Structure formats: structure tokens, C-alpha cells
């Protein structure tokens, strides 16, 4: 490989890379979206990189990096990719390693925002706020307490966290202030973290779900976690349980979730993520849009966002790209879990 091109290309989602240029003086920073004038494809990316070599890429969530795309990028001299976000399920890590490329992410942004959003969704479910929305009988039904018969006291509720990284721990901290009894399952967290956080660690998914009043998902999407919450897992939750997901949609088998909601086995669900976004042809989304799921709340993958977190993410991603260009050790290289 020859000398690394001192150019950074933002591959998707973003327009003018003004903040990135501030972070990387002396480095040419371009937006693929601005260059091609439409939502970029992998073919657009490869064509532009061949014409205008880039040493590092900043990738958001819309571009998928397959084995063939990564091999071609490696041959074109791309040293590495920084995923502007926490998850990296749109990058084939094995193929990236084979191509000699370093993949990084930005795990230390937006933690508070996602944790706050998860708590808001959790409270929406447990306080039955879907039933509090004005309907055709409003205001005649103003004092109809039957709509709130399922509301449970938060103090002592068993909150199950699937995944106990930065965000999971931030949710635990917030939930404890409400009096939740927090338990969690994450085989990748070092031993003893339960003592530090004054929570309960369990050793299996079954132990996590059995008897839980609420399940909140905070794990990465991988082949190990894809559809981890399926019909069998949902059946372990008690009939009054609620589910919140601010991680990745495909961790849940959405057809099984829809069936559990329609049968009444689950009391409520609030999701910031779906398996495919935008959710074209998604049965769960379609039923929600038709008003068939009053105990469901969907938000459009915005848990990560605040004005401050958006700036934080872009600056940190750009700084990591700069380290890749200069051949310095990156701060957040992604490793392949075995």
C-alpha cells in the first residue's frame, strides 16, 4: 500500500461536513451525498474513491459495507472506516480485517440521550400513557379509571436489561432512582460490575426474562443477538410485562412481538428502532399506523439525538478518522467477538 491519501470521505446521511473540517485542518473532507447528489450506493462510493482516493471513511447507518465493497476499498487505499455511532452491524468485520482495514466506532457519545429516551419509553409503557390519549369519547371518559387498571407501582418493579454497557448502566442508574429492582444479562461484561452498580447479574436469558415486569434492550446487533428476543423468549415474560428497545430492531423477532401484543401476552411495547428503516412493508409498523396497537409507541430512531450529542458524535468521528490517517492508534477500534 502506498502513501495514505490525506482525504476523508463521509459516505452517507450527511451533507456539508463543516464540523469535520474544523476538527481536521489540512485534511480534505468531502461528503459523498454532496458529490453524487442523491442517496449514495456502494457503487457510488467505489467510483468516487477510485477517482478521489480517501485514506479514511466516516460511515453513518445508511451505507452497507459488504465483503466485496470492503475488498475494493482496501485495494483503493482506504486505511479504515469510522462508524459514526455505536453499532457496526452494517460492516462485515471479517471482510474488513481480510482487506487490512481498521474499523472504529464512537461508543462514548449520546449515552445520556439514549438512557433518557429509554426511561421515557419505559414510563410511557408502565404508566399506560397510550390509554391517556384523547379519543372519540373524550371528555366523557375523562374519569374512566378502567383505562388505567393495568398501571403498576414503579417501586419494586423488576426491570430486566439485555446488555449492560455504557447505556445499559446509565439506564440502571436512572431506574434505581425510581425504585426499580434492576437485573441484567451480558456475558461480555467483566465480573463484579453488579457490585459496582448495586444491581443483580443473571447468567442466562431465561433468568433475565422470567418474572420481569419490563425488558429494555441495550445490546449490539450481531449474529448472536439477531432475533434473540423471539416467540420463545417473549413467552418467558409474564403477561403484564412491557418491552422497550432503543438498541437495534433486529434483536427482536417483530412477527413474534406483534403476535404477543395482539394476543395480550405483552401489555405494551415502545420501540425507537425497527428491523428495517424506513419501515416499508413492516407488519408491526403498518398495524401501528392503522391505529391497531394502542399499547405501542414508535419513535423514528431518535433516541441518540440532542443538539449536543449530534455535534459530539461528528467531532469524535472526525478525530478518530484523523488518527487513522496519521497512522496513530485509534481510540475505539472494533474487535471481533469470538
Give the ranges of each region predicted by the language model.
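Phosphate-binding beta-alpha-beta segment of Rossmann-like dinucleotide-binding domains, i.e.
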Residues: 99-101, 107-158, 170-173, 192
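Phosphate-coordination loops involved in phosphoryl transfer and adenosine-cofactor binding
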Residues: 5, 78, 155-158, 240
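Rossmann-like adenosine-cofactor binding region
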Residues: 53, 65-69, 183, 187-284
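Glycine-rich Rossmann-fold phosphate-binding loop(s) that bind the pyrophosphate
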Residues: 164-165
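Rossmann-like dinucleotide-binding domain for NAD(H)/NADP(H)
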Residues: 240-338
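A short helix->loop->beta-strand "cap" motif at the edges of active sites that frequently abuts
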Residues: 75-79, 99-101, 180, 239-241, ...
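An N-terminal-biased, well-structured beta-alpha scaffold segment characteristic
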Residues: 2-104, 210, 230
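Gly/Ala-rich phosphate-binding loop of Rossmann-like dinucleotide-binding domains
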Residues: 172, 176, 261
Amino acid at each position: 500500500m502506498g502513501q495514505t491519501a490525506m482525504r476523508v470521505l463521509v459516505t452517507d446521511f450527511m451533507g456539508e461536513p463543516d464540523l469535520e473540517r474544523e476538527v481536521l485542518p489540512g485534511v480534505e473532507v468531502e461528503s459523498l451525498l454532496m458529490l453524487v447528489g442523491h442517496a449514495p450506493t456502494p457503487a457510488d462510493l467505489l467510483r468516487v474513491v477510485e477517482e478521489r482516493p480517501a485514506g479514511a471513511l466516516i460511515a453513518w447507518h445508511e451505507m452497507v459495507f459488504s465483503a466485496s465493497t470492503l475488498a475494493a476499498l482496501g485495494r483503493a487505499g482506504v486505511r479504515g472506516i469510522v462508524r459514526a455511532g455505536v453499532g457496526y452491524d452494517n460492516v462485515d468485520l471479517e471482510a474488513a480485517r481480510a482487506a487490512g482495514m481498521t474499523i472504529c466506532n464512537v461508543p462514548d457519545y449520546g449515552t445520556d440521550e439514549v438512557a433518557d429516551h429509554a426511561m421515557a419509553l419505559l414510563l410511557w409503557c408502565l404508566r399506560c400513557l397510550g390509554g391517556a390519549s384523547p379519543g372519540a369519547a373524550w371528555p366523557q371518559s375523562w374519569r374512566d379509571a378502567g383505562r388505567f387498571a393495568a398501571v403498576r407501582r414503579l417501586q419494586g418493579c423488576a426491570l430486566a436489561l439485555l446488555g449492560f454497557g455504557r447505556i445499559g448502566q446509565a439506564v440502571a442508574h436512572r431506574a434505581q432512582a425510581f425504585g426499580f429492582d434492576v437485573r441484567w444479562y451480558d456475558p461480555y461484561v467483566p465480573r463484579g460490575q453488579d457490585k459496582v452498580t448495586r444491581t443483580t447479574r443473571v447468567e442466562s436469558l431465561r433468568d433475565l426474562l422470567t418474572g420481569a415486569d419490563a425488558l429494555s434492550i441495550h445490546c449490539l446487533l450481531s449474529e448472536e443477538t439477531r432475533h434473540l428476543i423471539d416467540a420463545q423468549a417473549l413467552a418467558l415474560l409474564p403477561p403484564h410485562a412491557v418491552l422497550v428497545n432503543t438498541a437495534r430492531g433486529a434483536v427482536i423477532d417483530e412477527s413474534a412481538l406483534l403476535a404477543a401484543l395482539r394476543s395480550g401476552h405483552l401489555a405494551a411495547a415502545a420501540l425507537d428502532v425497527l428491523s428495517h428503516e424506513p419501515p416499508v412493508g413492516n407488519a408491526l409498523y403498518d398495524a401501528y399506523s392503522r391505529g391497531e396497537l394502542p399499547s405501542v409507541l414508535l419513535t423514528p430512531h431518535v433516541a441518540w439525538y440532542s443538539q449536543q450529542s449530534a455535534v459530539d458524535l461528528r467531532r469524535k468521528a472526525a478525530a478518530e478518522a484523523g488518527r487513522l490517517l496519521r497512522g496513530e492508534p485509534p481510540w475505539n477500534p472494533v474487535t471481533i467477538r469470538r
